[in-house]
Amino acid sequence: MHAWEAPGSLSRALPLASSVLMLLLSCLWLLGAGPSLRLAPELLMEPWQVHRLLTHALGHTALPGLLLSLLLLPTLGWWQECHLGTVRFLHNSTVLALATGLLAVLLAGLGVSGAAGGCGYMPVHLAMLAGQSHHPGWPQRTLPPWLLPWLLLALTLLLSSEPPFLQLLCGLLTGLAYAAGAFQWLELSEQRLQVLQEGVLCKSLARCWPLRLFPTPGSLGELPVTYPAGVRPATPRPPYLASSDSWPHSDGSAQLPPRLGPGQLTWKNSERGLDWAGSSFASATTMWAALDEQMLQEGIQASLLDVSVQGSQSSLWLPKPSVSSLRLQQLQHMGFPTEQAAVALAATGRVEGAVSLLVEGLVDTEALVTEGRSSPAHCTGTGAS
């Protein structure tokens, strides 16, 4: 799967924020707007110049610095946006750019020469890399993750003279502080993130092509993945370890309940059902909620298997009042067959539970939804695929 392909997407789409940022940096360079965005402490006293604390990252005055920033956006920025989500990626980038500007101005005010006066996006790249390289989902390479930001800092100093060294160092230190939890109070909560992603604008951008808004993996607004009939991934993806903050400075870690080993939790079998419920494994409370959902899924599967064992001894028929037409239409719009959707709804009574059964391929029943109670519809049985 390519880095810019969202799970379950039918066509390739580029991450929206990183791609638009590349266009913006290029346009500002062509317009010669770099000097007017320079982080100059002497100009920040004017009210209309405060924007430089944030917009200093968008301007460039040296071509090597611009090319290096543009090169890192598709190689590093796309990966970060796909794994953080577009909204959280924009939020983290904005917070780190502003914090870097404030730290540079503070050092310049203390008399440290060269701490400010430059511009460029490289300090934000360093800050994002320093914070994201400690994330559990970061690809394991030969080099240790903590060494990557320092190598990028040395490479930037060799290839470009912009921004100044101290401004680059401010960006790297800001990222390390972010990874340590210094900005945890500025993090987007899961509720606020869900509200933003469920807005009309975000929903519209999530359907766009070739630039697409990526939802935060594991968030409540992310629907489970559906595959066409007969198409299944070779190896299931591990569930996302979602938490209130995507970077690893949470206070606690998930623990298993007493007398329950990790082998008893079939996370792979119920992966998409847990994703639909938006379960978060970052605390013990959410772990118990996930366990309750897991036990419910196992009970539903056992009840369906009991129906398949009876076979020809009893026939399955679904009266129409037992199946909600609105919920059935929702499943039909997702692309599920009507007969299987009706059986899953009758077994669970909830759309999310029915989606979980259908996605896992546990419903293989041909049933008919009847108008009354007098004409039963025979089925071929239910079993695990």
Curated annotation (Swiss-Prot):
One MF term in the entry's GO annotations: serine-type endopeptidase activity
Domain UBA: 322-361
Keyword field contains Nucleotide-binding: no
Subcellular location(s) per record: Membrane
Record keywords: Membrane, Transmembrane, Transmembrane helix
Spans traversing the lipid bilayer: 13-33, 58-78, 95-115, 146-166, 168-188
GO CC annotation terms, alphabetical: membrane
Region spans: Disordered: 238-264
Membrane topology: Multi-pass membrane protein
Primary residence: membrane
Any one GO BP annotation for this protein: liver development
Name of protein: Rhomboid domain-containing protein 3
Protein's organism: Mus musculus
Gene: Rhbdd3
